[in-house]
């Protein structure tokens, strides 16, 4: 059983998947930081609010300065600022993955399919006949060999 597990783990696709997950997690942290630390402060400044992560609606009705203060008071909140940050994270991640896949597909060499054999015409019934045929399948006439 241990040998089977070792064989399974050492397969190329399992290792590729593990590397992909690790790189994806690290890349996700980079995108998250770019959104939270670079993009959202600029957007927040343009809209007159500095911190998007503190945009929320208190469902209890009280006034709280931050999401943390509302949570400390036990007030339920709709954290739409955090939701906007997370949505922007997703959109940027999806765009980058789309561009990477598009570039990889462009680089990947595609094999051109072999050209289909051009059928010749039977001189007797004028039907299409395979180039290597010695007899017409339609009229059964004997055909001359092609050079």
Curated annotation (Swiss-Prot):
Record's keyword annotation contains Cytoplasm: no
Gene3D superfamilies noted in UniProt: Large-conductance mechanosensitive channel, MscL, domain 1
Keywords linked to the UniProt accession: Cell inner membrane, Cell membrane, Ion channel, Ion transport, Membrane, Transmembrane, Transmembrane helix, Transport
The protein's name in its UniProt record: Large-conductance mechanosensitive channel
Highest taxon, organism lineage: Bacteria
Function field: Channel that opens in response to stretch forces in the membrane lipid bilayer. May participate in the regulation of osmotic pressure changes within the cell.
Gene symbol of the encoding locus: mscL
Species, as recorded: Trichlorobacter lovleyi (strain ATCC BAA-1151 / DSM 17278 / SZ)
Lipid bilayer topology: Multi-pass membrane protein
């Amino acid at each position: 059983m241990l040998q089977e597990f070792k064989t399974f783990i050492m397969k190329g696709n399992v290792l590729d998947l593990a590397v992909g997950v690790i790189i994806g997690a690290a890349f996700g942290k980079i995108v998250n930081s770019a959104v939270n630390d670079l993009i959202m402060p600029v957007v927040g400044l343009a809209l007159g609010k500095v911190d998007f992560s503190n945009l929320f609606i208190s469902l209890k009705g009280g006034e709280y300065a931050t999401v943390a203060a509302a949570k400390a008071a036990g007030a339920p909140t709709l954290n739409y600022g955090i939701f906007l940050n997370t949505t922007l994270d997703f959109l940027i991640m999806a765009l980058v993955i789309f561009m990477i896949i598009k570039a990889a597909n462009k680089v990947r060499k595609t094999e051109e399919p072999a050209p289909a054999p051009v059928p010749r015409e039977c001189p007797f019934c004028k039907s299409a006949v395979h180039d290597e045929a010695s007899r017409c399948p339609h009229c059964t006439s004997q055909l001359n060999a092609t050079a």
